[in-house]
Amino acid sequence: MDKQKTFGINEAQNLLSSVTAPWVKSLDLQINSISNWKCKFILNYNEKLVRAGNIICGQAIVSAADTAMIVAVISAIGKYQEITTVDISCKYLRPLSSGGLIETEILKLGQRLVVGRIIVKDIKSSKLAAEISCTYARL
């Protein structure tokens, strides 16, 4: 069975609308593409996410990345399953001032744990802004 036909962009957008907390919805994360174990999302510039210096705050970057990976994990599984973040670690490499391109990659899809890597690039310059490693538990 082709999992991408059963869990594509429309299903992922519905997932974001139905299971995330209200404040997560305010990130306005846009799904760009979904494929086997890799997904791309766009975090648009939003003044609600900006801190002093006119850059997107780190908390918003990690929240958007975590949310994007949750969608990627559900997509790889092929149907909705409860999961939770076990560990997430972020290295900020440069300020993100114009919005971000978030690229997720699942490194291991186990029966109980899922390990992933996320990179966040500046949407205008394509320069790497953050590198994130993460682990999720399948409940």
Task: Please report, for each region that a protein language model flagged, where it lies by residue.
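Terminal targeting signals and extreme-terminal segments of soluble enzymes
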Residues: 1-139
